Amino acid sequence: MNLFFEKTEATNVAEFSVSEIAGALKRVVEERFGYVRVRGEISGYRGAHASGHVYFSLKDDKARLEAVIWRGIMEKLKFPPEEGMEVIAVGKLTTYPGSSKYQIVIEALEPTGVGALMTLLENRKKKLADEGLFDEAKKKPLPYMPRIIGVVTSPTGAVIRDIIHRISDRFPLHILVWPVRVQGDTSGREVADALKGFNALPFGGLVPKPDLIIVARGGGSLEDLWGFNDEAVVRAVYESALPVISAVGHETDWTLIDYVADWRAPTPTGAAERAVPVKLDLEVQVASLGARLRMGLARYFDFHQQKLRALVRGLPTVDQLFALPRRGFDEISSRLQRALCVSCDKKRFYFHGLNLRLSPRLLNTEKELRNTKEYTARLHRAFVRNVEKQRAQLEVASRLLKSTSYQNILERGFVLALGPDNKLIKRLVQFPETGQINLRFFDGEMSVSARDHGLNRSSKSKRIKSKQDDQGTLF
């Protein structure tokens, strides 16, 4: 074993990454097997995933094979998978490198055995009957003398020849044949598309719209007639605006289309007899040319359809391109959902614990807090009102003080005399004989010298008013 881990020049053992090995195995499996048919029992089926995809296993008594059906394929299946049902699966083998598993990507699924088909048929019949698709009151009356009859059947079988022959003998009229496969995996879908196509034809168009539709097929086993038990066929007949006659199999053969059709004929010949009331000759040449044209068109379309399918098989499908991302997304989605559930449970337990810790004291505290907030708001409003009131009173006092200020008197032209001791001189007797006197004006001060000029200092002396003395009194 050490030889594989020793990096010497002599070793020839190649080194691969895990992704390279997984990719190589994936290519080998897909290129070696391609499409396979696998018979097995469905195990582990739990319905469709949230994304619409289906995951389960196919098993027998010795082995198990993982299987997946993408949503687009699941919607086209004729029957829903069930736990324990034995089926035949058709698909491609591939691997899922994320978990080193190999699986089959199923593209077609069918049950094995008549018993399984009968069980599936009864379940489908009950489901459609519960929806009211088989009610007799909802069936449409057949026209007495249709101008054009549309026939949905195989263009090369004996059924169409019997219908054409019988209608031609009774009443020659215009017959429209919509060629379909009456047996196989695609027969049900083709019949449903044909019914919808007849109803979609416009009146007065290049292709005339029929007044009556006949869906016909010869007899066969339950598996051969299974396409006419398709739910899409039943719903197409129910939704058809044109009356429909079913003529599938022999008189003892019953399919779901017989329950929903407006009239059931025991045989295709009986359908032709019910569709037209009289018997006339049909021009053989026109019938022969019509049959040759239909067969030629059928061969032409079959050839080009097979060629186109060969080209399509070489292209990767959307499901193949998105197989791995879809699988990874589904796994991540499942983990995310589980994680969300766990997180919610933890939070719920946490909040439950907090709820148990709550007490009436906390509620009283909350009530006191609300009261405190209310008192604070009221105190704030009272404080604001008091401040506004004091501001108004202060403004009144300020205006009164300003009106009594001596500065206002000085502005009117008066002078304030101050003695040497800087005291106000109010009377003449206070005037000093010598020294400096300060005179204060409105816009400044000045000093003057006091001299005695023999002024009469008597307080009772009269002041002689000169002609130039027009100054008013100070007080």
Swiss-Prot record:
Its main location: cytoplasm. The keyword Nuclease applies. It catalyses: Exonucleolytic cleavage in either 5'- to 3'- or 3'- to 5'-direction to yield nucleoside 5'-phosphates. The keyword Cytoplasm applies. One of its GO terms (molecular function) is nucleic acid binding. One of its GO terms (biological process) is DNA catabolic process. One of its GO terms (cellular component) is exodeoxyribonuclease VII complex. Heterooligomer composed of large and small subunits. This is Exodeoxyribonuclease 7 large subunit.
